[in-house]
């Protein structure tokens, strides 16, 4: 056998040993609780991925794997339905964090409070309340919870639904929304993408990231968008034109939505654009220090 062949066999053997060691080092998690339909679940999880799934049963079921040596505190199931649960998983190393994953099934009407470090979090079919806090991972929500508070420092936040009340915050992560009744979203350098839905009230803020808005306006809607240097791009239907108040300090305004031409601001700096609309067609306020504001039709 050649020297290259010997090295190849050695590499394969090492990979098999590493894989077997990793599997052996993992610990399975499985526990279930009888709970009330509106149970409050608090989970601190130091694992790679967390899935929260709403279902019709009045029970909470936690399954998954964690690395050996992890601290796991999942409590003891009681004799009757409980109104509150506190769950805790702490992995010993960063590598151990990546190896762990949890799936938590909760009643649809549950309120879930979740805090993780670098986990990627996915939530689906929960109609109660969600409070999600992640440092380095992403957050994805499918469905329309009653309340949603989601914060990720570096990861993206995607909301595929229309929560009644929503607040989303990132530092560098992008934000993607599909509408809702009362929306608040802010980022420092990430982008905010809001499209393919309807909104009643919204306040979107970014420092350097772009804002792209293409939501339909509910009757009497109120929308505010503000950036420092990030561009603002707004797409609107021409069928029910809202009142629009747009202004920049040094940035440009381009109106491709109507024939009204923006005018120079005070002292020749920046631009302003004021458009009248119907009393019930909504109002949009756009502000940027030096970012460009663009209006266009849908």
Residues covered by each model-derived region:
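Intrinsically disordered, low-complexity terminal regions
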Residues: 1-298
